Amino acid sequence: TGLAYEVVPVYHEDAAGVNTEKMYRNITERWRWGGLDKVTKKGQVYLDETVRRMLSSNRGAIFDLARCLGVEAYNAKINPASVIYGNLPDSVEVVAQLTDAEQAKVDKYVSDRVKKIQTLLKLQQDKLPEVAMDYTFIEYDQLCKIYDLLYEITGDKQYQEKCLSLLETELNRFGKFMQYYESLPAPLYNSLSSQDLMIVSYYPYLIRQYYKYSGMDQKKTENLLRSLEKKYKFS
């Protein structure tokens, strides 16, 4: 549905988790924003724990919708007949070539989804900016997956570069933490908080994601690692 969960006694494996049309309309036309778009520098406003949770939930809702729109577009690209005939049972195989008019309908469908994703990402960036509150681990991961999906759909390198840029930002953000952790003697390292230990495990994950989203470009990934090691003096 739009933003709420519906409890219904029916399950269907083809049913999407998000009603993309309704939710897109709700977010772009019906949401009332709280003024965070006026924030121009970090620390300008104080956000308490409750507000931060709400902000994160709203970002997550936008990213969930963007991802679902991306999945719809991707599925239309790999199975264009689904746009024309709907989701057919696996036992039914469509072998007919699409007409020019049908292909145009598929292209329009994919383009519509891509434009909606772009609108959502711009809206999130404007109304819930990172300068007001840093992205969480999960939000960075969601954003990277969305940009990678856009790259898969369109083949446009700008989306891949944006994805890799986000990962580089995160790696630099936590590079100084890794430098500090490696400097600790064993007793102090063993006393690190769960949050610190999460960063320790998160860092290698970011590197793996960079390698994956770069198209498994080993040279590009190795160059990044050398740059990080030189900058933050960790191994």
Where are each of the predicted segments found?
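ER/secretory pathway lumenal C-terminal domains and tails of membrane proteins involved
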Residues: 1-235
